[in-house]
Each structure stands twice: as C-alpha cells, then as structure tokens.
Amino acid sequence: MAEDNTPLCSFCGKEKSEVKQLIAADDANICNECIELCTDLIADSDENTDDDSDIDTSWVNKKLPTPKELRAKLDEYVIGQDAAKKALAVAVYNHYKRLKVSQTLANDSKKAKIGAADAMVELAKSNILLIGPTGSGKTLLAQTLARLLDVPFAMADATTLTEAGYVGEDVENIVQKLLQASDYDVSKAEQGIIYIDEIDKISKKGDNPSITRDVSGEGVQQALLKLIEGTVAAIPPHGGRKHPQQELIQVDTSNILIIVGGAFAGLDKVIQQRTEKTGIGFNADVSSKDDSRRSSELLQQVEPEDLIKFGLIPELIGRLPVLAALTELDEDALVQILTEPKNALVKQYKYLFDMEGADITFTKEALDAIAKKAMARKTGARGLRSIVENALLETMYELPSMKNAKTVLVDEQVINEGKTPEIA
C-alpha cells in the first residue's frame, strides 16, 4: 500500500517503482505503460479513419451543372452544333450523376438514407460517339466539357494504336496519358475524360477473313472494348515501360468517360442506301445532285447498323450508346467562330497585338475571305488559324522592331492577295 505522498499514475494507479517512468504534472501523473497504450489506441483509430478515406467522395458534395447549364457554357466556346451539344450535355450529366450516386452508396454514412431498393440498381456507363467532318468541333467539345467540369482530360489518335505486343501505342498508353494529366493522382484519373479521335480509321478492312492479322483495325477495336466498358489497367510509374519486378499503378477505368470521334467519310452513302430506294426503270426513284440531301443531314439519321456496315464491330458500337452527329460548318458559322467565342481567334490576335502596343482590326470582308478560304480547303474551323497566321506572319515579324505603330488593319486584300496589312 502506497503512502499518501507516494506519486501514482493517475490512470492505472501504479507507483513510480512499478514502472520505468512516471511523468508528473500539477494535477495528474502518467506512466510510460499508459502512454504506450494511448499511442496504440490512436494508431488503431487512424487506421480505421484511413480505411474510410479510401472511399472517394469527391463528387458527393460537388454541385453538378445541369444539362442546360452545361449547354449554356458550351455555347460560350463552341459555335453551332446545337443537337450535338444537347446530347453531350445530357450524357455527361448522367455520367457524373452516376458517379455521384456510386460514391454516395460507397459512403457508409449515406447508405441508410438511400434505401435498399435503390442501392440494388446499378447505373451503366454511357460512353459517347461523335460523328462529324474535320474541323466541326468534336475535339473542342470534349476538351471544353473536361475544363468546365474540372476533370483530367487525355486525347489519343486511334490511328497510332496497335494491339499490345506490336510496334506502336497500345490502349493502356491512353490511360497513362490521363494519369499524367492528373499528376499521378489515381482517384482523379479514374474520374477523367478520354477522347479518342479518328476512330473511323480503325474500321475493319472487310468482311472476308484475312490470313494476315489486322493489328491496327479490328484488333484495336477489340483492345478498346475493355477500356471502354471498364477494366483495371496496370500502368508503369512516370511514363516508363513495363518490366518484371516493377510496381505498377492500378487504374480502374469503370468511371472514366470515354468519348470517341471521327469524320466517317462515306458513312452518308451507307445511310443513303438504307433510307432511300434506288432502282432502274420507269417507276424508279431518280435522285439528282440538286435535290439530294446534304451529307450532314444524312448523318443525323445514323443507326448502329450503318456503323457496322462501315466497319466498326458490333461489340464496340454496343458500348457507345450515345451517338451525336455534328454538321459541317458553313461560312456564317466560321465567321462567328472567328469573332464570338470566349477564346475566339480574332480576340487572341487582338491580345497578342495589344502586348506590342498596337490595335489590330479585321474588316468584315477580311473575315468573310478567311471563312471562304477555310471552306475551299475543307478544313472547317481547324484551318482558320493557319490562314490568319500566314496573312499576319510578316507583320508579326516586323512589329516588335517598329516604333510608334498604333494600328494594324487587315482587309480582304491581305487575305486573298497577300498584301501587307496597313500599319499606322
């Protein structure tokens, strides 16, 4: 029995002589054994907390823009393509709503509020296929959506892809690009957007079996299936190559939104064969150039069977349930693209020339001439920058060395005849 003045541990009651160390304070004492016990309890608590933190809840409390809000934001950056914007806005909204629901269900504290019946419903992923001519805005739409939602974005060209084991990029390289875009934050990458362009260029070479392996056509389509529907990709760290005894980064693609796009040149003919009767004789329907529907109008009627005839495999089409067709841009739309969006080309050049202390002006006739040139080149909006760049090359070379240059005027002759812009 300890005497009244013998110091005791305030928690276990042991005397100083019974423990290695007793730390004294004004009103209480604690021994080394109780300190070790408390340390173990805190460590166990931290481990439990870490288990809960493995559940990604980044979308649970995030405000998701409605389809109308997404469409309105797209209008600020992309001209025209109203039908495609609407389809994209709905598909993207449903995709991230699905992500929000799955994260809420994974969070134990929320499960009770949702109910057992709802918890049994599994929402499928709605990947997107964009069909439209070169320069119609497919890539820009995908990039803009990723920026608006603040999610990582990666882009790949389907023509560079080959089956794993062959020279070229394999499908896992696309996931690696997304991981790099998210600074190797796996949870961020798993919620990103991947855009695969030129998907039409990997169509099957034909229905007849071939003795040579089609490693960049149907083979790549087969390889893309798992990525699109959801798989766990093993990615080497920091962009290196895989090798034995290497620790790989596991990335689940189940929640990555996949958007694929292509020009699909000739698809309009496939659709026309399906939708219009053709024949020879007195009662045959004769179609002429004047009354035939435009290619973009036919693309609006695309059906999965048309894509199968074009050369995409049915399994791939089945994993791309959202089809959106973009129309070819006319001259008026190209002029709007030059001037109206937030990052319009004319605004960009005005900013560049402002930094040199000069104000650049494009006449209406100059803008029309730029649009006409782009139409003639059949490059759509993609060709606008090169036309303006060529017209202003000499001016941008000379201007930084000129003193007191205040205005630069670009008129129709500058675009069509290569005349030097007026500088005053």
Swiss-Prot record:
One family name in Pfam for this protein: AAA_2
Q: Which UniProt keywords apply?
A: ATP-binding, Chaperone, Metal-binding, Nucleotide-binding, Zinc
* Entries under Gene3D superfamilies matching the protein: 1.10.8.60, ClpX chaperone, C4-type zinc finger domain, P-loop containing nucleotide triphosphate hydrolases
Sum up the protein's function in the record's words: ATP-dependent specificity component of the Clp protease. It directs the protease to specific substrates. Can perform chaperone functions in the absence of ClpP.
Any one of the GO BP annotations: cell division
The family note in this entry says: Belongs to the ClpX chaperone family.
ATP-binding listed as a keyword? yes
Name of protein: ATP-dependent Clp protease ATP-binding subunit ClpX
Task: Write down the PROSITE patterns for this protein, in alphabetical order.
Answer: CLPX_ZB
| Transmembrane annotation, as ranges | none
Alphabetical GO CC annotations of the entry are: HslUV protease complex
Domain ClpX-type ZB positions: 1-50
Q: Which GO terms describe its molecular function?
A: ATP binding; ATP hydrolysis activity; ATP-dependent protein folding chaperone; protein dimerization activity; unfolded protein binding; zinc ion binding
Recorded hits in SUPFAM superfamilies, A to Z, give:
Glucocorticoid receptor-like (DNA-binding domain), P-loop containing nucleoside triphosphate hydrolases
Q: Please name the InterPro entries in this protein's record.
A: AAA+_ATPase, ATP-dep_Clp_protease_ClpX, ATPase_AAA_core, Clp_ATPase_C, Clp_protease_ATP-bd_su_ClpX, ClpX_bact, P-loop_NTPase, Znf_CppX_C4
UniProt-annotated binding residues for ATP = P133, T134, G135, S136, G137, K138, T139, L140
Q: Which domain of life is it from?
A: Bacteria
What does the entry list as the binding residues for Zn(2+)?
C9, C12, C31, C34
User: Which species is listed as the source?
Assistant: Psychrobacter arcticus (strain DSM 17307 / VKM B-2377 / 273-4)
Subunit record text: Component of the ClpX-ClpP complex. Forms a hexameric ring that, in the presence of ATP, binds to fourteen ClpP subunits assembled into a disk-like structure with a central cavity, resembling the structure of eukaryotic proteasomes.
